[in-house]
């Protein structure tokens, strides 16, 4: 199985700890995860940490299940300042190929390996994000890749031959499934399931 790392992008620099903000501030954090997902758990944990550390000065409000938009819409809203934070799915590989590393099959062996890759690549990720108008606040994981379908069990890449499946937007993921002989249809992550 492959571990997918998700990138946490934000348009605003996190200068919230400075005294420049005398008034209360509310920040919106949108994501596409459903209730109970790792998306929700990660975002809720981030909000709890910030809210706890900042007291009444800052409140991070979370909006899951694509309430503020799907992945691409959230990225646009980040640039427009309509959303302060987003936890995108694999859509970041559409922004810059650098982010496609986490869509490549079977190159991440386990969580420790993933952490080493993230640490080694963080400067490249941040540069790619900055070049496209984003700032990475942190990285989050979304578990192991699973392939579900109603045709047959998938235990080898060859088992995908002729299988129609839905996949989140992501250049490399789409290419991978096509190379394995599947017929993937890409769509927003929140529409896949």
Regions inferred by a protein language model and the residue ranges of each:
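Bacterial N-terminal signal peptides that target proteins for export
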Residues: 1-8
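Bacterial N-terminal signal peptides
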Residues: 9-15
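Extracytoplasmic "Venus flytrap"
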Residues: 28-45, 64-69
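Residue-level recognition of beta-strand->loop/alpha-helix junctions
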Residues: 31, 62-64, 89, 188
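Contiguous mixed-secondary-structure segments that line small-molecule binding/active-site clefts
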Residues: 47-48, 79, 84, 89-189
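Extracytoplasmic small-molecule ligand-binding "clamshell" domains
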Residues: 45, 52-53, 59-84, 108-110
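Short, hydrophobic alpha-helical packing/hinge segments within bilobed ligand-binding/sensory domains
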Residues: 71-75, 173, 192-193
């Amino acid at each position: 199985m492959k571990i997918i790392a998700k990138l946490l992008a934000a348009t605003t620099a996190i200068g919230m700890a400075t005294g420049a903000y005398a008034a209360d501030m509310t920040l919106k954090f949108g994501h596409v995860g459903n209730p109970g997902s790792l998306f929700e758990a990660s975002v809720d944990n981030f909000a709890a940490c910030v809210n706890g550390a900042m007291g009444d000065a800052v409140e991070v409000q979370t909006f899951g299940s694509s309430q503020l938009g799907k992945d691409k819409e959230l990225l646009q809203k980040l640039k427009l300042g309509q959303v302060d934070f987003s936890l995108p799915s694999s859509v970041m590989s559409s922004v810059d190929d650098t982010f496609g590393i986490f869509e490549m099959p079977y190159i991440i062996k386990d969580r420790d390996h993933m952490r080493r890759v993230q640490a080694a690549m963080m400067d490249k990720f941040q540069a790619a994000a900055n070049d496209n108008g984003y700032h990475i606040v942190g990285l989050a994981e979304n578990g192991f890749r699973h392939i579900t379908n109603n045709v047959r069990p998938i235990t080898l890449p060859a088992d995908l031959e002729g299988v129609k499946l839905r996949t989140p937007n992501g250049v490399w993921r789409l290419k991978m499934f096509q190379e394995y002989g599947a017929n993937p249809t890409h769509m927003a992550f929140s529409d896949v399931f």
